[in-house]
A protein has these predicted regions:
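Periplasmic/cell-envelope proteins involved in peptidoglycan metabolism and beta-lactam response
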Residues: 1-208, 230, 313-323, 365, ...
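Beta-lactam-recognizing serine transpeptidase/beta-lactamase-like catalytic domain environment
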Residues: 131-136, 140-146, 184-236, 240-488, ...
Length: 531
């Protein structure tokens, strides 16, 4: 007794779509909970217009009715990769967790996914008695076993709205990431991945279509490059090398190494820019000398008296890198985190059939070669140096209503490098900010520490920065990674400085506002290559 065509016109769907929906609804493979005697979801999220028309004509469609429900809304247009989104459960979701039934919503990305169980709450239960025709005859045992629904828990994020908005502005027209962390807690203050999208596109009936459009975009706006991008860290990695060489006794703070246009030994040349030579650690960091760190690695890997074999030396080196947060997932409370890559001896034994030495792998000492890291790992390195030897696993959730954070995020994680050696690295990063490769930071009235990186790439080099401020009692650690941005001083340092100023001062100076506007307008031509 159903006028199917009238129903289709009312809901603004075709007859073919009606048939497809009914087939899906009755298919027990796609809808395991189907029963002709229980209510089934035919269509969700009607538009205001369709709802109004349907309400007027509902009496013509026996068996169909409307049920109100809450849907997710996002107030602002920023932080899409952090917030994530929700969507209707898939058959696999239902199969994996019997909490869900068709028509339920589940977190798909970001915080929505990581904290799904805290956000979803608990469903209410009402047990009803029905006759053989499915008609309700009353409550079972007068509702004795019924249960009221329990709302999900409120989450408080650590994201600073103004900082996040500024970071997204600065990266417009560029591919890359900005991550800022509070060193004393591990709380993530901003996590910017560019290109991005408006999280409000992932709400409502158009979510599926909008998701398809974003998925097809060759610049991959759905990719959270802050935790999924795996890049060479470039010269920001030199800080880890200095700490390792000092802690292992390969060098002292005053040990100098020569650099005449680079590292030159046994026919191998690793170039470097002009600066005084020879240099010890602190000025080698401030000038970003390649030669110093190449020599340091060469002497560590070749020290058979201390390590016995190059393999044992290499694995000791790797242990230091892992202790500093590289080569494994840090454990951030967001889905999809990549681990980056830190090679061990077996990698080179396989590649070179056991015939290799420090010269073979010299490029890893300057953050090139096989070494890769995520922007989050680079920012975490900044936080570790700021803390002089320990870090908290970075996280975006600051507080869970009536609950405690996982101890993963509240326990300190110490590195293998000795605490006293961090002061030399801090001195080098401060010197870089006052007169070295990060000297653009000298304009600020807070004591910033920084390290540039210019990561070699098949095309134009990537621009990288890692730093923190102030030098003592630091409040913020920052990593900036701009694909094909050129020198670290071209994009990394100025963008990192603006992020520091915004957070420490609460607003940008008039001069900095003009500089931020300038960088917002800058575009990098990436051509038509898919990334």
């Amino acid at each position: 007794n159903l006028d199917t065509l009238e129903l289709c016109r009312t809901l603004n769907i075709t007859r073919e779509e009606f048939d497809a929906r009914m087939l899906k609804l009755k298919d027990r493979n796609r809808n395991p909970g189907y029963s002709r005697y229980t209510q089934q979801l035919f269509m969700s999220q009607l538009s205001d217009k369709s709802f109004s028309v349907f309400q007027e004509k509902m009496y013509r469609f026996p068996g169909f009715y409307v049920q109100r429900r809450s849907i997710r809304q996002y107030k602002h247009s920023i932080a899409a990769h952090v917030l994530g989104d929700v969507a209707e459960v898939s058959p696999s979701d239902i199969e994996n967790d019997d909490y869900y039934i068709p028509g339920d919503y589940i977190g798909k990305q970001g915080v929505e996914r990581s904290y799904e169980k805290q956000l979803r709450g608990e469903k209410g239960i009402q047990i009803l008695l029905r006759d053989v025709h499915g008609r309700i005859k009353g409550s079972y045992m007068n509702g004795e076993h019924d249960r009221l629904p329990v709302p999900g828990k409120n989450l408080t994020l650590s994201i600073d709205y103004k900082l996040q908005a500024l970071g997204e502005r600065l990266l417009e027209g560029k591919i890359g990431s900005i991550v800022a962390i509070e060193p004393s807690t591990g709380e993530i203050l901003c996590m910017v991945s560019s290109p991005t999208y408006d999280p409000r596109l992932m709400v409502g009936r158009l979510r599926s279509e909008n998701h398809k459009v974003l998925s097809r975009d060759s610049w991959k706006p759905l990719l959270n490059r802050s935790i999924m991008g795996q890049y060479p860290p470039g010269s920001t990695f030199k800080t880890t090398q200095g700490l390792t060489f000092l802690s292992e006794g390969i060098v002292t703070p005053s040990t100098p190494f020569p650099c005449s246009g680079g590292f030159n030994f046994r026919g191998l040349h690793v170039g470097c820019h002009g600066h005084p030579s020879p240099l010890p650690l602190v000025p080698s960091l401030s000038t970003s000398c390649n030669g110093y760190f190449c020599w340091g690695l060469y002497y560590m890997i070749g020290n058979k008296k201390k390590y016995g074999t190059v393999q044992d030396a290499m694995n000791k080196w790797r242990d230091y890198m892992v202790s500093m947060g590289f080569g494994y997932r840090l454990g951030v409370d967001l889905p999809g985190e990549k681990r980056g890559f830190i090679p061990n001896a077996s990698v080179y034994d396989k590649a070179y059939r056991g015939s290799w030495n420090g010269l073979t792998i010299i490029s890893i000492s300057i953050g090139q070669g096989e070494v890769t890291a995520t922007p989050l790992q680079i920012a975490n390195l900044g936080a570790t140096i700021a803390n002089r030897g320990y870090y908290y696993v970075p996280h975006v959730v600051k507080e869970i209503q009536n609950d405690n954070l996982d101890t993963l995020y509240t326990n300190r994680h110490y590195t293998m490098a000795h605490e006293e050696h961090y002061e030399y690295v801090v001195q080098g990063m401060r010197a870089a900010a006052t007169g070295g490769t990060c000297r653009a930071l000298a304009q600020y009235d807070f004591e910033a520490c920084g390290k540039t990186g210019t990561a070699q790439n098949r095309g134009r080099d990537h621009s990288v920065f890692m730093g923190f401020a102030p030098m003592n009692n630091p409040k913020i650690a920052v990593a900036v990674y701009v694909e094909n941005g050129g020198w670290g001083a071209d994009y990394g340092v100025p963008l990192g400085g603006l992020i520091m100023e915004q957070y420490l001062k609460g607003e940008l100076s008039e001069t900095s506002k003009a500089r931020a506007d300038e960088f917002q307008k800058r575009r990098i031509n990436y051509g038509t290559d898919r990334r």
